[in-house]
Amino acid sequence: FRPPYAQITPAQARLLGQRYKLVMWDIISRDYNRKLSPRTCLRNVTKYLAPGAIVVFHDSEKAFRNMRYALPRTLEKIRQMGLKCKAIEF
């Protein structure tokens, strides 16, 4: 479970932790911000890429323009760095 806005109270964490694994992110693309250019969105991610990083992109209409530009370029950068994307194992 990824808490919206990366905000969660200790009580919520305890309750959710009974049924779910909590997953926080390291890097947020801010693709939802229509004031940001697609290139800025890409920089928000690639500037901080590192092994083990968890990156957030959003699958919403609001984020589509930036995500459509930044996601494939982020994946290419990941390959260039010799890193791999994989599912989180629980």
Q: Locations of the language-model features?
A:
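Conserved, mostly hydrophobic/aromatic
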Residues: 1, 22, 55, 78
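His/Asp/Glu-enriched short active-site or ligand-binding loop at hydrolase and phosphoryl-transfer sites
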Residues: 7, 12-48, 82-90
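Acidic/histidine-rich helix-loop elements
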Residues: 34, 62-63
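C-terminal domain-boundary segment and adjacent tail
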Residues: 65-90
